[in-house]
Design a protein with these regions (language model features):
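Transmembrane alpha-helix termini and helix-breaking/packing motifs in multi-pass membrane transporters
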Residues: 27-37, 89-90, 143, 147-169, ...
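Helix-loop junctions on the cytosolic side of multi-pass membrane transporters
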Residues: 119, 123-124, 166-195, 388-396
């Protein structure tokens, strides 16, 4: 049993390190922007370059992971991410286009890596029970990596020179890459054809969007991640302005991490609060999330801000988990788990790119960060109202 668990353990560590660095690199780039005199809103523009590979490569990365040995795909993903960080050492860091190129490269690595980390699990487990536990563990390692990547990784990036924090990021990606060599290589399906699979992706996409339950869940989870992505960038800029905290302080990333703690708590309690047979009731928590988003930018008391960010995360966690569960369950039956995740990634990242673009435009025309956060809240409200109307199609 121990011998079989070794590759799984290596996969968990690979995933933890890679996801930690994915979250830390955002803070490295935020510091580079600040050092070069760019406005905090520019981080939203740079963030879009990370989301775009998920949109453009979505139809191809699943087939790529299935065609080749998945452990090799993990190596390739980490290598591309590491290349994105290496570019930071050689580019003109005062050029926004060059910084976008680096983050775009990291995004390409992330989108290549993503399907393989889930797709390899059935190859490393013997039965459905083992697979279920392995899935739960990889999710737990990912959540822990997001928390520590924002809190710890963000703090390291804030307290060290960009050159040093970039070096640490690179080292973490290389460590993650090293761990993948403990995972056995199992042959992929060489008969897969990219053209046919890409066409299949859009047919499956249509299939999921035509069914009310899966369409509701795809739009709902997409709206949640759009808001989360914009909030992360906006709150990073908002904390120093509203709470008077030095942007280079350790506290900034810790305050930002409270939202993730809230999401974990919400995700944990969601099954007790929302029965799956009435999963659309999670919309109530979506409206709760909207209310807090439009309220919290007007406080300047740190403790109140932390409580509200914790609460917005909690509301978001309860909002998203029932929809995620229904989507994975229905999607698995309709088109398969891997394809459902690929379509979900496509929609989420498309909306994250759109949301970040709208946030950037709002700040570009001179509206305050607080006003832009409220604007994002109103965008979320638009999606929620659409889902209220759409809910009538679901007979549950």
């Amino acid at each position: 049993v121990n011998i079989r668990l070794k590759p799984l353990q290596a996969l968990y560590f690979t995933q933890f390190l890679s996801a930690f660095a994915d979250n830390m690199i955002l803070f490295v780039i935020a510091n580079l922007l600040r050092e070069n005199g760019f406005s905090p809103a520019m981080l939203a523009l740079v963030s879009i370059s990370f989301f775009l590979p998920y949109v453009f490569l979505a139809p191809l990365v699943g087939p790529f992971a299935d065609k080749h040995a998945k452990s090799i795909v993990l190596v390739i993903g980490n290598l591309i991410k590491a290349l994105g960080v290496v570019l930071l050492f050689f580019i003109d860091q005062s050029s926004i286009m060059m910084l976008m190129l680096c983050y775009f490269t990291v995004g390409v690595g992330a989108v290549v890596y993503s399907p393989a980390k889930y797709g390899i699990l059935p190859e490393l487990t013997r039965n459905e029970d083992e697979l279920f536990h392995a899935n739960a563990r990889i999710e737990a390692y990912t959540i822990f990596a997001i928390l520590t990547g924002i809190g710890g990784g963000g703090a390291i990036a804030n307290m060290t020179a960009p050159l040093i924090s970039s070096g640490i990021c690179l080292l973490i990606y290389l460590l993650s890459l090293g761990m993948t060599f403990f995972i056995p290589r199992m042959k992929g399906n060489a008969s897969i054809r990219y053209g046919a699979e890409a066409r299949r992706f859009f047919i499956d996409f249509q299939h999921l969007m035509n069914r009310p339950e899966t369409s509701f869940a795809l739009i709902g989870t997409g709206a949640f991640w759009m808001s989360s992505a914009v909030l992360r960038v906006a709150v990073l800029a908002w904390i120093p302005l509203a709470l008077g905290i030095n942007p280079e302080s350790f506290s900034v990333s810790l305050i930002l991490a409270t939202t993730s703690i809230g999401i974990i708590a919400g995700a944990f309690l969601a099954p007790k609060l929302i029965p799956l047979s009435h999963f659309t009731r999670s919309l109530t928590y979506g409206f709760g999330m909207f209310l807090i988003i439009v309220l919290f930018p007007w406080t300047n008391i740190t403790f109140v801000a932390i409580c509200l960010l914790l609460l917005v995360g909690f509301m978001g966690g309860v909002f998203i988990i029932p929809m995620n569960t229904v989507l994975q369950d229905e999607g698995k039956r309709m088109v398969g788990s891997g394809k459902t995740i690929a379509i979900q990634n496509f929609i989420e990242n498309l909306l994250m790119a759109v949301g970040s673009g709208i946030y950037y435009l709002i700040t570009y025309i001179g509206i305050s960060i607080s006003g832009a956060i409220v604007g994002q809240g109103l965008l979320l409200l638009g999606f929620l109202l659409y889902l209220v109307k759409y809910r009538r199609r679901i007979v549950r």
